[in-house]
Amino acid sequence: MGQEKIRAVDGVSFTIEEGEFCCILGTSGSGKSTLLNLLAGIEKLTAGDIIINGSSIKKMNEKKLSKFRQENLGFVFQAYNLLGSMTALENVELPLVFKRLAPGKRKRMARSILKKVGLGDRMDHKPKEMSGGQQQRVGIARAFVAKPKIVFADEPTGNLDSRTTIEVMELIKGMALKNKLTIVMVTHDISLSKYADKIIHVSDGKITEIEYNENPLGADLGTAEAADNTKADKPEVTAKNLKKAKETDNNTVTGSDKGEIKTNMGEPGKQGDPVKIKETSNEESK
């Protein structure tokens, strides 16, 4: 039985600027979640490269990549991903434990950010004792507590009602502005994309449009100083000709660890000058 190549992310290259709120928008199966996982170093590249603050994700081994994520990245998940045996305070402390901060300091930092997300009276509650919105607030606090440079959010409001969705989005946007952080959010909900400065539309593994939002929702949620400085000249995330191959045998999918760095920034097979937005690729084999 032969193999058929499926391009999960096909000919995609782009740059996300420092301090930018970028939304990757697409329907289920569009390749948006695969793209997010590649950017965050969760899935390995088959080809291409991702540069974050001048560091190549592709060149890092697992140990270096793990350290890089701990020091630079935060994550907000659709399913919250809280540890049920731990309190809100203990869940938020976890990233600080991995950074080997002293117990007293990490508790102070965790308490401070839980108060900022409106959970000052829920610190000793476990996930099952909180609503979905409260659990996601804990997740947001955990993502921001270690002061990452970039926060990746994968369908952060997927399990929430419309009212709580607005509250969570305003919380993420406000904290990003006040701390001058970069946000990369994946969603299928076009209404959430209105909070973003840049919207990358993805369909069938390809970028169909890159839209710039001059009047994003929540622009007034940060301080005036933070809002004026959200966009910087320094590119923070650059994706170059990404490819990721997966092979299927009797419908079983396994990831490929093999990869290469492409220096060609133009269309496949053509030499091009570096630009901020280009085509990028991610392949799956079936």
PLM segments and residue spans:
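ABC family nucleotide-binding domain
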Residues: 1-202
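Serine/proline-rich low-complexity intrinsically disordered segments, especially terminal tails, linkers
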Residues: 15, 30-32, 220, 258, ...
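Conserved beta-strand-loop-alpha-helix hinge in the C-terminal portion
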Residues: 206-234, 243
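Long, low-complexity, intrinsically disordered segments
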Residues: 257-286
